[in-house]
Amino acid sequence: SLKKYKITKNYFLPLGKSLEYGNIKTNVNYANTLKLFSKYGSDVFYSGTIGEDIISTVRNVKVNPGKLSKIDLLNYEVKERNPVCSLYRKYKVCGMGPPSSGAITINQILGIVERYDLSKLGYNNSETWRIIGDASRLAFADRGKYIADSDFVDVPIDKLIDKKYLKFRSNKLETKMKIPEIKPGLILHKETNNYI
């Protein structure tokens, strides 16, 4: 929750409540962070003040503190990853591949809802939000089972964003009711085109 942490509470909930639609919010701290990067490069992150702030926050957070150290940042090596892309209607949607789960999950959600005309249903329609919510739950179930660091685990990216698989998963949304129990889909081997 945004209320848990003073910094997020102050930023996102000024005066104790969220901003109204149309309000403009600036982020001076983020602007200052970008200025530091432009002036000092990545060193400000790995061995400078930004890294020190991150380490302090991770180690001193009240809920589930971590053990991140300066050595961890200094020893970190950037790895380039192939993007994960999929078509949603006429748009090519791309994002970072594993170990990040974002691109796969977003492309799954979009693939699952693609058969629905959400604009026709309308933004304030409960059915629109049920479809989006259940599609998200299905994608997050797959994320929890199949997505990890591809340096250590074989992540079936192509199968997870396969149009036939996502159409099969979207069949679960036909109930007109919230899906009571969400389970990850069963990704089968190459020799079959069936999904469970």
Each PLM stretch: what is its role?
Residues 37, 41, 45, 58-62, ...:
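A generic secondary-structure signal for well-formed alpha-helical elements
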Residues 16, 115-196:
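Internal maturation/activation junctions in enzymes
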Residues 104:
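Flexible, polar/acidic helix-loop-strand segments at domain edges
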Residues 1-41, 45-47, 51-97, 161-162, ...:
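Noncatalytic scaffold domains of N-terminal-nucleophile
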Residues 99-101:
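Solvent-exposed loop/turn segments at secondary-structure junctions
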Residues 108:
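Protein kinase glycine-rich loop
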